[in-house]
């Protein structure tokens, strides 16, 4: 079972549908309606932290889930979930270089892990005003995708299967978003 933590976002069920193409065993829970202990009891094979409004400080249990389950379960964070990954490991999340709500832009990625099989650059959908600030990125996280102007678009933990995507792979404006989700579900992260 894949656990999808919902940060009260309208994209959560789009993400649910994409994940369901590759694994139909999904449980959706709200970020303030579950505990670490309950997640332990559920014993998901992986965890997805959804997009959402606001900042990691307002994302319920998400930062704690990332801290607790890193090294135990694969984790994918999308948009706010990506920012929660940054915050969980000590990065600063602050205003992005450019506010991007419902806009498409090209990102340049390293072609590994979640980006396996994809050309670089790839066009993605962005809906965010916050971003991980590069100069605060901890040593345990590596940047695996950026925009042309240097905004971080994806990070990966160097030792554990934890990946964050600032953009929305579940949006129709993201090229090859299904492939990215498929890579994650199949453990290619």
Where do the model's predicted regions map?
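Short beta-strand segments
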Residues: 4, 125-126, 166
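C-terminal and late-domain segments of enzyme folds
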Residues: 142-189
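Cysteine-nucleophile active-site neighborhood
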Residues: 44-117, 123, 181-183
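N-terminal beta1-alpha1 cap of cysteine-dependent amidohydrolase-like domains
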Residues: 1-71, 80, 175, 182-189
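Short gly/ser/thr-rich secondary-structure transition/capping motifs
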Residues: 27-33, 56, 105-108, 124-128, ...
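Structural signature of beta-strand start/N-cap positions in the alpha/beta core
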Residues: 1, 24-25, 45, 74-76, ...
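Catalytic beta-strand/loop cores that center a nucleophilic Ser/Cys/Thr
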Residues: 111-160
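Histidine-centered divalent metal-coordination motifs
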Residues: 79, 128, 168
């Amino acid at each position: 079972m894949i656990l999808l933590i919902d940060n009260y976002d309208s994209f959560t069920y789009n993400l649910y549908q994409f994940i369901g193409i590759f694994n139909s065993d999904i449980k959706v829970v709200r970020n303030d309606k579950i505990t670490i202990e309950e997640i332990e009891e559920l014993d998901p094979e992986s965890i997805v932290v959804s997009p959402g409004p606001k900042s990691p400080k307002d994302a319920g249990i998400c930062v704690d889930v990332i801290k607790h389950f890193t090294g135990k379960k694969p984790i994918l964070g999308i948009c706010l979930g990506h920012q929660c990954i940054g915050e969980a490991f000590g990065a600063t999340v602050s205003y992005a270089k450019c506010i991007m709500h419902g806009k498409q832009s090209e990102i340049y990625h390293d072609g590994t892990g979640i980006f396996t099989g994809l050309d670089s650059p790839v066009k993605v959908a962005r809906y965010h005003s916050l971003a991980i600030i590069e100069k605060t990125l901890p040593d345990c996280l590596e940047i695996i995708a950026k925009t042309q102007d240097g905004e971080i678009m994806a990070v990966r933990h160097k030792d554990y299967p934890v990946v964050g995507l600032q953009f929305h792979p579940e949006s129709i404006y993201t090229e090859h978003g299904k492939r990215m989700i498929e890579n994650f579900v199949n453990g290619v992260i």
